[in-house]
């Protein structure tokens, strides 16, 4: 008997109440292929009745505090009964696709007793997702849901979701300057939410539209079992209007002088008020999307940079609070590195107050 023949004998697909959204998505895929209805029950029966196929995503983990066990269990019997189980649901849609598109084409064989698949990597994360969140997001005919569905089908577990709603950010510059183009990708936290420090710096309609796009992408990720996350250039420059209001919070110059016609500056991360500003923004974002799972920080390029790091395009520079500029290179580098780590820890701690599994990642080659 082939898997296709066994699937034709499925009469009912069962999922449990309180399941992650991806369980319903995987059930819909199986229902489409089998014609069987989907039933939600209080709990799944351990004994499989003929023709009943169960789909589940238990939150089992290998160790306390660790991510869900990524193991996938697939069982399909000749009478149409079976199970599809993926810890946490991260690989559930990929497993459902694999069952109906690949395994079903062969002999039922080992599927009758059940097989287990342990992915080599528990994380398969898109990095600089050109089509969903970066420059390619504005191409004609792009369907975000089809794209996210394909990510899940390929076995991705995490997806970037922070994208601008418009083709370009609100960064402006002198006539003929190309530098504003560098702000269309990896948008910073302040493109989605504000804090008590920078409230009003960007118009509400702009922030709300961007946040709505982020939340749409996060909902799609959730639907297909992917963990939503962010890739941001941080700390990124802010409009000069901000420093007219708070001149003491000016940080390093971060633009590339070959490409910019005017300097750009970030806030100084050594001032407590700026640290509070970042913590407030992370908290606000987590309040909107509590299951955000990661923040990938890129820096020292595209209008972002850490003060007093040597790889800034105009060289070491920054505010007056971190260290005196006449100190030697080794001492400045050590102090700058300590503050970089402190900033990343600040972001993590603010997010972990909502999602304890949140992770902060950084790209090291630019330093």
PLM regions: where:
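Feature activates predominantly on carbohydrate-active enzymes
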Residues: 5-6, 10, 14-21, 26-29, ...
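Short helix-loop-beta junction
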Residues: 29-37
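Short, well-ordered secondary-structure micro-motifs within conserved domains or adaptor modules
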Residues: 37-68
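Acidic carboxylate-rich catalytic motifs and surrounding loops in phosphoryl-/glycosyl-chemistry enzymes
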Residues: 41-44, 233, 360-367
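Active-site neighborhood of glycoside hydrolase catalytic domains
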Residues: 273-367
């Amino acid at each position: 008997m082939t898997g296709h023949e066994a699937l034709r004998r499925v009469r009912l697909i069962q999922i449990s109440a309180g399941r992650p959204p991806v369980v319903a998505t995987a059930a819909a895929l199986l229902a489409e292929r089998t014609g069987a209805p989907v039933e939600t029950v209080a709990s799944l029966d351990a004994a499989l009745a003929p023709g009943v196929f169960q789909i589940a995503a238990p939150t089992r983990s290998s160790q306390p505090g660790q991510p869900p066990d990524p193991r996938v269990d697939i069982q399909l019997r000749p009478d149409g009964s079976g199970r599809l189980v993926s810890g946490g649901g991260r690989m559930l849609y990929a497993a459902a696709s694999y069952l109906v598109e690949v395994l079903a084409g062969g002999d039922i064989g080992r599927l009758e007793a059940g097989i287990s698949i342990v992915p080599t990597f528990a994380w398969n994360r898109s990095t600089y997702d050109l089509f969903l969140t970066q420059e390619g997001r504005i191409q004609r005919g792009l369907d975000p849901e089809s794209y996210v569905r394909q990510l899940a089908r390929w076995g991705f577990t995490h997806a970037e979701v922070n994208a601008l709603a418009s083709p370009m950010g609100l960064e402006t510059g002198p006539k003929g300057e190309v530098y504003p183009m560098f702000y269309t990708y990896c948008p910073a936290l302040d493109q989605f939410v504000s804090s008590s420090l920078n409230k009003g710096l960007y118009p509400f309609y702009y922030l709300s539209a961007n946040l709505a796009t982020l939340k749409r992408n996060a909902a799609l990720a959730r639907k297909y079992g992917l963990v939503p996350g962010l890739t941001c250039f941080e700390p990124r420059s802010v409009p000069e209007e901000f420093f007219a209001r708070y001149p003491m919070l000016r940080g390093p110059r971060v633009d590339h002088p070959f490409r910019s016609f005017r300097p750009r500056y970030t806030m100084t991360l050594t001032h407590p008020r700026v640290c509070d500003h970042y913590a407030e923004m992370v908290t606000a974002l987590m309040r909107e999307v509590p299951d955000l799972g990661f923040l990938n920080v890129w820096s020292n390029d595209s209008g972002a940079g850490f003060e007093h790091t040597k790889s800034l395009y105009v060289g070491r520079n920054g505010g007056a609070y971190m260290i005196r500029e006449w100190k030697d290179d080794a001492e400045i580098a050590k102090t700058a590195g300590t503050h970089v780590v402190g900033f990343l820890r600040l972001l993590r701690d603010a997010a972990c107050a909502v999602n304890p599994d949140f992770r902060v990642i950084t790209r090291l080659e630019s330093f």
